[in-house]
Structure formats: structure tokens, C-alpha cells
């Protein structure tokens, strides 16, 4: 499924193991949309057993390409501590990164997370969001 780079795909489009295999191939070839959708699949347990660490891995691969939905998803993973150690600073960093990349849905989450943080931590997250991948061990 080499078209994955050019189409918007949702997990519901993957209905069997053969399609999942094709999608995995596209993700391994660097298709950010396929990487993001694999993150969603592992995050939600669609077709495969739910695996938050695997979800984080695939979201991070897509985020390396500035895929805004993956940046937002990473914010949620850090906010909830799903597959990673919970961190409001890293959650806010990813939400800021997604917002800067045009994902306006991040703004609500920015407000929610920032309300429970100290001003200096909010500022740190804002600074880190300029180059979020430098702040994450992959």
C-alpha cells in the first residue's frame, strides 16, 4: 500500500491481517500517515492487542516528520502516562508542537494541562516545543 503517503487513512479501513501487513510495510517505508494510523491501531486495540508502548513508537515515527496528529497523540500519551512515564511538561510540549504545526484542536488540551502546572514549567514546555524531538529519547 504505497499510496499511504498520499491518502488519509483511518483504522477502520484496515480489516484484515493482509491489509495490516501492507500498512506496516508503508509505515516502515516512512509513510507518516501510515505510521500515525499504526499508532492509533495500537493505542485503541483495533485489529491488534492494545499496546501503548508500540503506539508511542509509531506516533513518534510520524512526529519525526512533523505529522501534527501524531504530535497531538503524543501529548495525550504523556498527559495520561500511557506507554510512557506521565509528564505534564512533555505533554504540553507536544501539544504546543502540534498547535504550532496547525493542529488547532491542541489549544483546549494546552489550557487543560497548563492549569495544573507551575509557570516556569509551562515556559519550559513552550521552549522545548521548538525542537521536541531533541527532548525525547527514541
Please tell me what each predicted stretch does.
Residues 2-41:
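N-terminal segments that cap or nucleate solenoid repeat domains
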Residues 5-9, 35-44, 48, 73-80, ...:
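Hydrophobic face of amphipathic alpha-helices that form TPR/SEL1-like repeat modules
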Residues 106-138:
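Terminal, low-structured helical/coil segments at or just beyond the last alpha-helical repeat
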Amino acid at each position: 500500500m504505497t499510496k499511504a503517503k498520499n491518502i488519509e487513512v483511518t483504522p477502520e479501513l484496515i480489516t484484515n491481517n493482509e491489509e495490516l501487513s501492507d500498512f506496516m510495510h508503508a509505515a516502515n517505508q516512512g509513510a507518516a500517515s501510515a505510521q500515525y494510523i499504526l499508532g492509533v491501531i495500537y493505542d485503541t486495540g483495533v485489529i491488534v492487542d492494545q499496546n501503548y508502548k508500540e503506539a508511542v513508537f509509531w506516533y513518534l515515527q510520524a512526529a519525526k516528520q512533523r505529522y501534527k496528529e501524531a504530535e497531538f497523540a503524543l501529548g495525550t500519551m504523556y498527559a495520561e502516562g500511557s506507554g510512557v512515564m506521565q509528564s505534564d511538561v512533555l505533554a504540553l510540549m507536544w501539544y504546543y508542537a502540534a498547535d504550532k504545526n496547525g493542529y488547532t484542536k491542541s489549544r483546549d488540551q494546552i489550557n487543560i494541562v497548563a492549569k495544573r502546572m507551575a509557570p516556569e514549567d509551562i515556559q519550559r514546555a513552550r521552549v522545548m516545543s521548538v525542537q521536541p524531538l531533541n527532548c525525547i529519547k527514541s
